[in-house]
Amino acid sequence: MGKQVTSNGKQFLSKADILGQQDMVMEDLFVPEWDAWVKVKVMTAAERDHFEASTVQREGKKTSLNLQGIRARLCILCLVDEDGHRMFSDEDEYALGTKSGAALDRIFSVAQRINGMRDEDVAALAKNSDGAPAEDSPFD
């Protein structure tokens, strides 16, 4: 079953169309600190949910941001090999976090951009239930 055209000319995707979309964008990035290239990918919705859940900490009505290892956590989800498979597991957070901050910043910036992560998105995550202002964003 393909796209359905309605009487007003709009084309709507079917379930099969949506699930069949090849929408995982990847970008090559040269990292001078390592004198090599890496491949950075867009996260799946599940990976983005995982990243956001690992970034926000809730205690009762209080919400705060967990910035510890944020660069490594995002890079773990977005660094892939040439075939698009993740290179790192969640358990590699500490090890990756010991690498060059400048190198991880480069990768983090590209991952942030291609995943559409804006300061407003993080601020919305950090807001607590009473509408108090969010803490400073880690995505500067």
Model-derived features with residue positions:
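Short, surface-exposed, charged amphipathic helix/loop patches that serve as local interaction elements
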Residues: G2-V5, F30-D140
